[in-house]
């Protein structure tokens, strides 16, 4: 059994394969983006690119998954990349310390 067995029951093998083959980019991994990144990887997305130039601060502790006393001062993309790899060691995470401005 693998960690995505329950998701595969819902999506089927073809759906799971499509999800596993998806590549997702998230711009901002704080409050909303952090929850989205974690949900995507827990669902089976295998490649994710994270863009954020901010660092974890004390004021993030009340609302952000990546914010703990041990991550204060870390770049948010690095803290999130560590967290996502802890959930699935095979996930491919691109962590980009930059703001995206269209």
Stretches found by the model and what they are:
Residues 45-88:
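Glycine-rich phosphate-binding loop and adjoining beta1-alpha1-beta2 segment
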Residues 92-94:
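Conserved beta-strand segments of alpha/beta enzyme cores
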């Amino acid at each position: 059994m693998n960690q995505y067995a329950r998701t595969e029951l819902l999506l089927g093998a073809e759906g799971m394969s499509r999800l596993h083959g998806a590549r997702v980019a998230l711009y901002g991994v704080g409050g909303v983006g952090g929850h989205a990144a974690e949900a995507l990887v827990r669902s089976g997305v295998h490649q994710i690119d994270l863009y954020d130039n901010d660092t974890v601060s004390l004021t993030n502790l009340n609302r952000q998954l990546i914010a703990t006393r041990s991550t204060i001062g870390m770049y948010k993309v690095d803290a999130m990349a560590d967290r996502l790899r802890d959930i699935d060691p095979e996930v491919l995470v691109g962590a980009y310390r930059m703001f995206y401005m269209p």
